[in-house]
């Protein structure tokens, strides 16, 4: 992501150092951090895909814009009284909040007007950036909000392309899981000529495809459902004549044990199956597994992130180590390496 929005408002698991501290107010130190990241990626011939905001509360996201414009406090997921339907209804208000949408436009203009302080390259000309995404996992959240959601997506895509004609643009979509399995919403959003390629995310655990990854007999169901999900969205990509990227997919370690010494046999099997789908569907042009955990490690006896902990691939409100692939996960890296060889 480009950066978070808003300072802490009582939700302790959110990003602690946002780029946008208040509407139209930006922390230059954080912006320089992004400059540094892009400069280092460029040295290594790596490419960034950057999204501007988030459906979810852990980076501020749409909820933060609502709070900035006088809406009640966000109903946070870790609150004992949390209600998923109320959260959806809350976030859906963003798409009819005119000042909220204007503030996102201001944020986008700020980012796309920036010149990297290290490389001196304007962001709109930076080869380290492969693509922009409108947001992470855009969802209308309610059926009633769908028309306003689609209108906002088209508006935002047009704004980004008007400011940057050099980079690719995509949505950041999960696929039809974002719209109660109404794949026509996914198709309409990606039919926009300003959108260059399609994205999907696949989350077997979050979507209730299994109860325990230690149960080997459950893996055929997981892999079968993943294949069906991919196949359904491949059809849309083929109809639109645009490439498809599977840009988020992950699985916990065996038995949902989060420590690095726990087996990743089932995760490795899942990754191999996902990578293998490209052979059957050449319109799939890339993958991004979730997520790189690096040298960070879960802290014994602690489930969620606390201030001062090392960052890994899992957002602070998720179990630390849940989907992270650590630097020492040799078998998983072997699967990834085998796939990379087929791409060369």
Question: Which ranges hold each PLM region?
Answer:
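Active-site mouth of glycoside hydrolases
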Residues: 1-209, 219-243, 249-336, 343
């Amino acid at each position: 992501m480009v950066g978070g929005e808003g300072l802490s408002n009582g939700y302790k698991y959110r990003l602690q150092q946002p780029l946008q501290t208040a509407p139209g107010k930006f922390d230059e130190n954080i912006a320089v951090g992004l400059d540094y990241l892009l400069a280092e990626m460029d040295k290594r011939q790596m490419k960034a895909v950057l999204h501007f905001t988030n459906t979810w509360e852990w980076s501020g996201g749409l909820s933060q814009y609502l709070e900035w414009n006088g809406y009640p406090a966000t109903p946070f997921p870790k609150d004992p009284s949390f209600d998923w339907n109320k959260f959806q209804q809350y976030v859906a208000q963003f798409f009819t909040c005119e000042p909220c949408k204007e503030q996102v436009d201001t944020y986008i203009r700020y980012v796309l007007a920036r010149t990297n302080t290290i490389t001196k390259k304007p962001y709109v000309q930076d080869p380290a950036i492969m693509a922009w995404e409108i947001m992470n996992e855009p969802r209308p959240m309610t059926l009633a909000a769908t028309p306003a959601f689609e209108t906002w997506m088209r508006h935002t895509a047009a704004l980004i392309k008007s400011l940057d004609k050099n980079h690719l643009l995509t949505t950041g979509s999960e696929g039809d899981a974002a719209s109660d399995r109404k794949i026509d919403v996914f198709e309409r959003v990606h039919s926009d000529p300003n959108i260059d390629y399609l994205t999907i995310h696949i989350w077997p655990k979050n979507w209730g495809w299994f109860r325990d990854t230690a149960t080997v007999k459950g893996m055929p169901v997981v892999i079968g459902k993943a294949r069906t999900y991919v196949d359904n969205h491949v059809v849309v990509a083929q109809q639109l004549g645009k490439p498809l990227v599977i840009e988020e997919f992950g699985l916990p370690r065996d038995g949902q044990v989060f420590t690095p010494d726990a087996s990743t046999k089932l995760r490795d099997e899942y990754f191999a199956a996902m990578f293998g789908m490209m052979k059957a569907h050449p319109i799939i042009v890339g993958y991004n597994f979730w997520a790189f955990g690096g040298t960070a490690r879960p802290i014994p006896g602690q489930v969620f992130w606390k201030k001062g902990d090392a960052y890994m691939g899992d957002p602070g409100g998720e179990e630390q180590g849940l989907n992270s692939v650590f630097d020492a996960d040799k078998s998983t890296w072997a699967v990834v390496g085998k796939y990379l060889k087929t791409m060369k």
